[in-house]
């Protein structure tokens, strides 16, 4: 398959060998410093892997710290041999930077995030979800049920990603879900996807009442705002940033992003 590649740049014209990761960092650091008119103080590779069907192209997901800036910025770069490109398109003219994401780090598959399934299952699924996201409400409860019915096939790792700007009620609901998750109470965690309360509700007491009405379980404010719950939410947000996730639900199968959100179904028993 021939790919249209834009902005291909030779790292060093006299080099004949492939670009090393160190060489890539050096070039990108100098290039971005000139472009941003600010020094890049740190650059690291978050994830990299060969792109199937591209005859040797690899994708690098980079994180860069800029002098004077609190937040790191991300950059997607493609390499092949001694070439570097900021743009690579597939046969249908889609930008690979729009259809690829970093691989899930192995450390994310830990016991505290294993919601259902066997940790030694053939396939690992990781989901980032918001209980008030309409697509999440449609997809995620079914995903949980499918994994629960096929524990030897799948292990489902659940991360919370409340979209607070559009669903402020998700803050309280997500905190309650973390409590249910820690208790191993999958049923009531799923119930939080169908609460009779506005997604725009900002009063925690109103949302907690909706949770009690739906589940029969009373959760106190002091429980949802504990240091432990705060740490868990902060940890989940870090993964969102690492994986360059921008919306929900975002699903990864065996480490790779599944933009269809249904890729796991091909492994279900017929």
Question: Where is each model-derived feature located?
Answer:
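Mature, Sec-exported extracytoplasmic domains of Gram-positive
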Residues: 118-121, 132, 248, 260
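Sec-dependent N-terminal signal peptides
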Residues: 4-14
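Structural alpha/beta surface segment adjacent to cysteine/selenocysteine redox centers
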Residues: 126-131, 137-215, 241-247
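A short beta-strand-turn-helix
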Residues: 106-123, 148
């Amino acid at each position: 398959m021939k790919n249209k590649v834009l902005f291909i740049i030779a790292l060093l014209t006299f080099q004949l060998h492939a670009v090393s990761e160190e060489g890539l960092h050096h070039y990108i650091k100098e290039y971005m410093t000139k472009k941003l008119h600010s020094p890049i103080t740190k650059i690291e590779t978050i994830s990299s892997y060969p792109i199937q069907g591209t005859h040797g192209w690899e994708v690098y997901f980079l994180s860069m710290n800029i002098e004077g800036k609190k937040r790191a910025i991300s950059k997607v770069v493609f390499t092949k041999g001694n070439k570097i490109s900021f743009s690579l398109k597939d046969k249908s003219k889609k930008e690979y930077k729009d259809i690829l994401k970093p691989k899930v780090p192995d450390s994310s598959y830990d016991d505290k995030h294993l919601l259902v399934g066997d940790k030694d299952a053939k396939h690992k699924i990781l989901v980032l979800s918001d209980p008030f996201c309409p697509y999440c409400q449609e997809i995620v409860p079914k995903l949980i049920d499918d994994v629960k019915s096929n524990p030897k096939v799948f292990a489902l790792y659940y991360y919370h990603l409340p979209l607070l700007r559009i669903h402020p009620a998700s803050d309280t609901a997500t905190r309650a879900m973390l409590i249910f998750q820690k208790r191993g109470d999958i049923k009531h965690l799923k119930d939080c996807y169908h609460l009779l309360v506005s997604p725009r509700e900002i009063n925690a007491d109103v949302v907690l009442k909706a949770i009690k009405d739906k589940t029969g379980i009373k959760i106190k404010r002091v429980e949802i705002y504990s240091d432990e719950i705060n740490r868990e939410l902060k940890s989940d947000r870090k993964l969102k940033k690492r994986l360059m996730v921008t919306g929900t639900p975002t699903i990864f199968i065996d480490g790779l992003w599944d933009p269809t959100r249904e890729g796991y179904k091909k492994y279900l028993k017929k």
